[in-house]
Regions:
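Chymotrypsin/trypsin-fold serine protease catalytic domain
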Residues: 96-100, 106-186
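Terminal peptide-recognition signature
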Residues: 32, 45, 65, 103, ...
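Solvent-exposed loop/turn segments at secondary-structure junctions
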Residues: 24-25, 39-41, 49-52, 70-73, ...
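Conserved catalytic-core segment of clan PA serine endopeptidases
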Residues: 2-22, 36, 62-123
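Catalytic nucleophile loop of clan PA
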Residues: 190-217
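Loop/turn elements at helix/coil->beta-strand transitions in domains of secreted/extracellular proteins
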Residues: 13, 39-41, 138-141, 182-183, ...
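Catalytic histidine site
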Residues: 10-70, 171-177, 189, 211
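C-terminal cap/linker of serine protease catalytic domains
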Residues: 123, 215, 224-258
């Protein structure tokens, strides 16, 4: 199966930025990924890129996905979130083993004239969608795709957050202090945290198709060797409970907002 490619032909448009307003009433963003489903309308991201964990429980404001984002461009339009499914354990007690979300978005829109929005169709029809793997042994390697922007602990800024970055690394079981999770997974990756949260971990990914299987989502980063540079991403393990959340979201239709 051939997936669509970004205008520059080098990065998969299934990845993009998720923009929202936080409890501080300021704009923020994460990374999100279009996933294949019946209604072709789902974005996968970290749970805390959907639910406000800094204030009383509730969804973040003005949530929108921009697939294929690059240096301010919106090549495939804007996809506004309509509804989402998260695990009750993350919503209720902030269990980061369940820090994932599947968001149903309306059809994409573009501004065709001042104050006029034009419907450009369903998300996965326009950019394709990644598959999903769960209940699998740890993959030997995964490709991590995201928009890192923040600093390393030493203050260096290796990324701008304006273009999609890709790293390939080995996965491993890990323990993370300060993060309420019992069985997080690590991947060797130099991504910094800010902006890369929500990044996709893809198995069997090929550059030619831009497609693979989603098998992890970055919820944190870690400096495992203490050199003041992040060298690992952290994800929940994708098990049957994650698949149940995905299945619930996959059955929800959205339609047009234009």
């Amino acid at each position: 199966m051939e997936g669509p490619v970004s205008p520059d032909g080098s990065t998969p448009p299934t990845s993009g930025k998720v923009f929202f307003i936080g409890s501080d009433l300021q704009p923020h963003w994460c990374t999100g990924t279009a996933v294949q489903t019946r209604y072709r309308n789902i974005v996968a991201t970290a749970g805390h890129c959907l639910l406000d964990t800094e204030a009383p429980a509730g969804p973040l404001f003005k949530w929108v996905f921009v697939p294929g984002y690059s240096e301010g461009t919106t090549p495939f339009g804007l996809y506004v979130g309509k509804q989402a499914v998260v695990h009750y354990a993350f919503d209720d007690v902030r269990d980061h083993d369940r820090d994932y979300a599947f968001v149903n978005v309306y059809n994409g829109v573009v501004s065709s004239a001042p104050d006029v929005l034009t419907n450009v169709g369903r998300l996965a029809d326009n950019v394709g969608g990644q598959g999903l793997e769960f209940n699998q042994p740890l993959a030997p390697t995964v490709d991590v795709l995201g928009y890192p922007a923040g600093p390393n602990p030493d203050g260096s800024l290796p990324y701008t957050g304006e273009t999609l970055e890709r790293s390939t690394g080995s996965t491993f079981a890990m323990k993370v202090t300060g993060l309420p999770a019992d069985r997080p997974i690590g991947v060797d990756s130099p991504f910094t945290g800010e902006g890369s949260l929500g990044s996709s971990w893809l198995t069997h990914y090929t550059s030619d198709s831009g497609l693979g299987y989603l098998n992890g989502i970055t919820i944190s980063v870690s400096d495992t060797d203490g050199d003041d540079r992040y060298d690992a991403g952290v994800s929940p393990y994708f098990d049957g409970e994650l698949y149940a959340i995905y299945r619930s979201a996959a059955g929800l239709w959205t339609g047009s907002i234009a």
